[in-house]
Amino acid sequence: MANLIVVCGPQAVGKMTVAESLRDKLRYNMMMNHDSIELSDRIFGFATPAQREYNAVIREKAFELAVKHHVDLIFTYVCAFDIPEERDYLMKLKDQFKDGGGEFYFVELSADLETRLARNETPHRMERKASKRDVAWSRENLLKDAEKYRLNSAEGEYWFEHHLKIDNTNLDPDEVADRVIAAFHLTAREKTEKEYRFGV
C-alpha cells in the first residue's frame, strides 16, 4: 500500500518547504508540481498543448508507479476550488491510492497576500523552480491568479475525510509539518536517505 499526501494552496504559500519537512520527518518520497512542469516546459515550451499533455502524462505515471510499488508520496498542487474539474481530479487521485490499499491526506495551506509575495522571491524558491526566476513575471502571475481563481476553500468547505486547513502565515515549515503528522497520526517509514531524497 502507498499513502498520498497532497499539500495544496496558492502560489508561494509555502507548499514546497512544508512538503520537504514532511518528506524528511516521514521519509516519504516527494513530487512537486513543478518537477513535471519544469521538465515539460524545457522540452515543449510554456503552456503549449504538448507541454500540458506531457506534464499530465508524467504525473499520471508517477502516481501509477507509486501505488504499484508501494511508495508513499507527497505531492504539491495549486487547486482552483471554483473549477469542478479540479475536484474531479483530486477525487480520482484519492480513489487511486485508496483502491491500492493506502490513504489519502489533503493539507490545505493559506497565507496572506503580503506574505506570499515575499515568499515568492526567496532564494530557495528560485533555486528549485527555474520558471520563478523571472520575478516580475512570477509576481504578475501570482496576482493575476489570486484575482481570477478561488485558491483556498471556503469556511466550512471540506472535500475529503482527511482534509486539514492550516494558515501558515506565521508558522515555519517544521511547525506545519508537525501539525500535519499529529492530526493524521502519521509515522515515519524505514528508508535510507537515498531511497526518499536522492540528489536533493
In which residue ranges do the predicted regions lie?
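Glycine-rich phosphate-binding loop used to anchor ATP phosphates in small-molecule kinases
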Residues: 54-108
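Conserved glycine(s) of the Walker
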Residues: 14
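Conserved phosphate-donor/acceptor-positioning beta-strand/loop module used by diverse small-molecule
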Residues: 98-121, 166
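C-terminal accessory "lid"/substrate-recognition subdomains
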Residues: 182-200
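Conserved substrate/cofactor phosphate-moiety recognition/catalytic segment
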Residues: 17-67
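The conserved Walker
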Residues: 11
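Small-molecule kinase domains that catalyze NTP-dependent phosphoryl transfer to phosphate-bearing small molecules
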Residues: 122-176, 197-200
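Hydrophobic anchor at the beta1->P-loop junction of P-loop NTPases
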Residues: 7
